[in-house]
Regions:
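N-terminal intrinsically disordered, low-complexity, charge/repeat-rich segments that act as generic
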Residues: 1-54
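Conserved hydrophobic positions within beta-strands
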Residues: 125-128
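Long amphipathic N-terminal alpha/beta scaffold segment
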Residues: 37-85
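Short, solvent-exposed secondary-structure boundary/capping segments
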Residues: 88-91, 133-138
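Non-DNA-binding regulatory cores of transcription-related proteins
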Residues: 74-119
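Conserved NTP-handling cores and scaffolds of large molecular machines
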Residues: 42-46, 106, 132
Length: 138
């Protein structure tokens, strides 16, 4: 982990805390586990102001490319607010398991991701781009 800890921008921290307060009623186990992981992640994160936020940190509205270290397959995705989720366009809600696993990491970090039962793979974060035109409804 490049920065030694997860880094989250202050407004996004507030937004995620609000989402967690109203999102505890999801019925799938995977989402319940993701929400719990997100809760712990933001509790352990370094919270910074917008002007202190490194551009290479994965956050809400980031477009990301991750590459599997085993077979070099590349997966592009964007992390969005729940109402903007569109899986056909590779836009994943911040409350989904994959974005929860990636949020707070930076370009060059290696993360362990599980896409199927008990099959964990290592991925490197190859690219992080910020969409500065999208606003978070706080």
């Amino acid at each position: 982990m490049k920065y030694g800890s997860y880094i989250i921008e202050k407004r996004e921290y507030v937004y995620i805390k609000r989402l967690l307060n109203i999102s505890g009623y999801d019925h799938t186990l995977a989402h319940k586990l993701a929400l719990e992981k997100l809760k712990h992640k933001i509790e352990d994160a370094i919270i910074v102001e917008e002007n202190e936020m490194p551009l290479e940190i994965i956050r809400i509205n980031s477009s990301v490319k991750i590459k599997c270290l085993r077979n070099s397959s590349v997966m592009p995705l964007q992390i969005v607010i729940p109402m903007d989720e569109d899986l056909k366009k590779q836009k994943f809600s911040i409350l989904s398991p994959l974005p929860v696993s990636l949020i707070g990491y930076s370009k060059g970090d290696i993360v362990n991701l599980t896409f199927s039962k008990d099959k964990e793979e290592q991925y490197i974060i190859e690219e992080v781009k910020q969409d500065t035109t999208a606003n978070i409804p706080i």
